[in-house]
Each structure stands twice: as structure tokens, then as C-alpha cells.
């Protein structure tokens, strides 16, 4: 996905550069660097960790209980009565299915929330890029990852970072 995005950005940059006239002002911004430097990113990570802490603890407890039952079945299965062994096997299978279902739901919810929060931050960055570009009179702003070389005087990353913070 990232390679595709870089390729698309490079293609867009090349297409834009073909139509750019000499009078156009072009700037470079490193969005990924801004994203990594934002204090809000760490705050969001802690918020999400707290949000999902209860469910994660519950899943860990379920996993421990399931492992205990599986060990008991392996250890004592040959000496147990057939009815007791069958009952324990059924419990283990039901608990394994329940655990699997809850773990998948947890992962999906966690990924969805992380994507939501990441998109909020990226939207703030995009708004800051537009604001800085407008103030600086830039006609085109290209992500630094899509550029092979650019003069550092064209880099507006620091200005955008100040705007976002």
C-alpha cells in the first residue's frame, strides 16, 4: 500500500511538473516526519491503550484459563473417565471458539479505532499544509517521499509542524 501510494504520488508529481510553469511556486513537506513528531500521536496511543485495556485483560484471562484446561486435558486425559474427558474436551472447544471470536472482534475494533484517530491527525496535518501553502503563496506542495531531490529552501515541514502543534 505504501509503495503504491509513493508510486501514485511520484506519478502525480511528474504529471504536475510537466504542466507547471516557471512562475509556479513549489514546496516540499514531509508528512510522515510531522506525524511522527506530533505529541498528539503519543496521547492518542495512550488513550487507545486505556480504551482497550479492559478487553485485553479479559482476553488474557480467557487465554490463561484455556491453556490451563488444555494442559489438564493433556496431563490427565488418559486417566479420566470417558464422560469427564469428553465434557472437558467440549468445554475446551467452546472456550477456544469464544476466545477466537472475541480476539478477532478486539483486533478489528482496535484497528478501526487506530485508523480513525490516525485519519484525524492526518486531516489536521493536511489543513496545516493548506494554511502554510496559502500564506507562503505556494501553488504546489509535494510530499517529500515522492521527490528525488529538492532544495531545502523549498521544505515547509517545520512551518507545518509549528502550525499543527
UniProtKB/Swiss-Prot annotation:
Region ranges (Lipopolysaccharide binding): 102-113
Chief place of localization: periplasm
Keywords: Chaperone, Periplasm, Signal
GO cellular component: cytosol; periplasmic space
KW Signal (keyword) present: yes
Subcellular location: Periplasm
A Pfam family of this chain: OmpH
Signal peptide extent: 1-22
GO MF terms held by the record: unfolded protein binding
Gene3D superfamilies given in the database record: Skp domain
SMART domains: OmpH
GO biological process, one term: protein stabilization
Keyword field contains Chaperone: yes
Membership in a protein family: Belongs to the Skp family.
Subunit structure: Homotrimer.
General function of this protein: Molecular chaperone that interacts specifically with outer membrane proteins, thus maintaining the solubility of early folding intermediates during passage through the periplasm.
Name of the protein: Chaperone protein Skp
Species the sequence originates in: Yersinia pseudotuberculosis serotype I (strain IP32953)
Amino acid at each position: 500500500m505504501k509503495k503504491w501510494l509513493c508510486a501514485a504520488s511520484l506519478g502525480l508529481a511528474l504529471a504536475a511538473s510537466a504542466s507547471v510553469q516557471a512562475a509556479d511556486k513549489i514546496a516540499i513537506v514531509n508528512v510522515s516526519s510531522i506525524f511522527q513528531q506530533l505529541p498528539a500521536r503519543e496521547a492518542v496511543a495512550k488513550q487507545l491503550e486505556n480504551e482497550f485495556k479492559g478487553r485485553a485483560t479479559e482476553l488474557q484471562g480467557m487465554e490463561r484459563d484455556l491453556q490451563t484446561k488444555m494442559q489438564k486435558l493433556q496431563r490427565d486425559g488418559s486417566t479420566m473417565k470417558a464422560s469427564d474427558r469428553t465434557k472437558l474436551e467440549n468445554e475446551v472447544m467452546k472456550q477456544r471458539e469464544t476466545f477466537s471470536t472475541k480476539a478477532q472482534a478486539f483486533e478489528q475494533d482496535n484497528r478501526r479505532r487506530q485508523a480513525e484517530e490516525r485519519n484525524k491527525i492526518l486531516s489536521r496535518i493536511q489543513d496545516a499544509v493548506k494554511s502554510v501553502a496559502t500564506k507562503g503563496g505556494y501553488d504546489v506542495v509535494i510530499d517529500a517521499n515522492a521527490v528525488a531531490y529538492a532544495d531545502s529552501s523549498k521544505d515547509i515541514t517545520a512551518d507545518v509542524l509549528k502550525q499543527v502543534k
